[in-house]
């Protein structure tokens, strides 16, 4: 038996963590909407930058806390102490690096998704002062769907052949992303939105920050609601790629869940920070495609060259290097005006 055969954080022993972590996240979200963003307003660049730093700092603090907790808890776990040659310090370091790598990977993939946010907000005519509210409730939905996807992914990975399937999905997704053209996004053709309109009348005008509007005793949905539904559907499709990608970094559900949630929490402020400049990163999709292909190859093939576990520090370096290079090259070689995608 080796360390890779044993779960470091089995759900039976750490169910309390999931409850406490989820409760803490919900509390943060309540404070965010009820205290810091009670009134609808346009999020300034300074405010977005401050909150981006705050969420990132909280993620790093959690990473450090997880490292310290691992140093304390692992020696008290008889399952781990029964593993020949188990090194507590090395295992704790591995946990911290896996969290950090998963967080960076999810945040990087989210940047590519921001272009969709910009287009959708523009399509539905959502003013900047109401965009935070849409993203707030969108993230609550994203947290729920991610939890479901992560639970399913964790259950499926008990079958070893599913690792190859996940790896194959990431490789195919990466290749498709690399060679796909930038197509115009048209929410009007979305089947889910058509279904919503069939069962719920929709107004053509906004009614403040409300998702619903009652007129003559009849309930109507507003464009804000349609925008929220479309973003939720987009996030579900996004999760199909991102969740397997993080399972390519670590197969510990606790690390996958926490790193994923922290990345999502920082997504709103990161959106307002980068929304005006996201179109500049035109080479980012190629960097992300390389990262997805790399993670897929790691799951399906490369791990076998390293006793079943590709070095996490090398994984982090490759992901940061590729993403950083694609961003820098995008700025050094800007896209020509006639190459801008239609929106």
Give the ranges of each region predicted by the language model.
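Multi-pass alpha-helical transmembrane bundle typical of ion/small-solute transporters
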Residues: 1-343
């Amino acid at each position: 038996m080796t360390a890779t055969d044993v779960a470091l954080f089995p759900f039976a022993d750490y169910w309390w963590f999931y409850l406490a972590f989820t409760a803490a996240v919900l509390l943060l979200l309540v404070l965010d909407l009820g205290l810091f963003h009670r009134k609808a307003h346009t999020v300034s660049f300074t405010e977005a930058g401050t909150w981006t730093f705050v969420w990132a700092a909280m993620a790093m603090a959690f990473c450090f806390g997880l490292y310290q907790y691992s140093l304390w808890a692992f020696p008290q776990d008889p399952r781990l102490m029964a593993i020949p040659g188990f090194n507590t310090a090395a295992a704790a370091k591995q946990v911290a690096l896996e969290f950090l790598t998963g967080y960076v990977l999810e945040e990087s993939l989210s940047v590519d998704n921001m272009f969709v946010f910009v287009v959708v907000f523009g399509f539905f005519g959502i003013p900047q002062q109401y965009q935070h509210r849409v993203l707030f409730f969108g993230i609550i939905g994203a947290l729920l769907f991610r939890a479901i996807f992560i639970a399913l992914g964790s259950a499926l990975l008990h079958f070893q052949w599913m690792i190859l399937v996940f790896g194959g999905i990431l490789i195919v997704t990466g290749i498709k992303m690399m060679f796909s053209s930038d197509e115009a996004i048209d929410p009007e053709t979305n089947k889910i939105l058509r279904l919503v309109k069939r069962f719920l009348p929709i107004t053509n005008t906004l009614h403040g920050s409300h998702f619903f509007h009652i007129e003559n005793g009849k309930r109507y949905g507003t464009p804000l609601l349609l925008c929220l539904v479309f973003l939720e559907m987009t996030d579900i499709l996004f999760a199909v790629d991102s969740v397997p990608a993080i399972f390519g970094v670590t197969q510990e559900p606790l690390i996958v869940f926490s790193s994923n949630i922290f990345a999502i929490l920082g997504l709103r402020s990161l959106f307002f920070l980068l929304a005006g400049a996201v179109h500049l990163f035109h080479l980012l999709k190629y960097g992300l495609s390389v990262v997805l292909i790399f993670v897929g190859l790691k799951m399906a093939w490369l791990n076998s060259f390293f006793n079943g576990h590709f070095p996490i520090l090398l994984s982090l370096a490759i992901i940061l290097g590729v993403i950083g290079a694609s961003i820098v090259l995008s700025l050094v070689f800007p896209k020509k005006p006639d190459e801008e995608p239609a929106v």
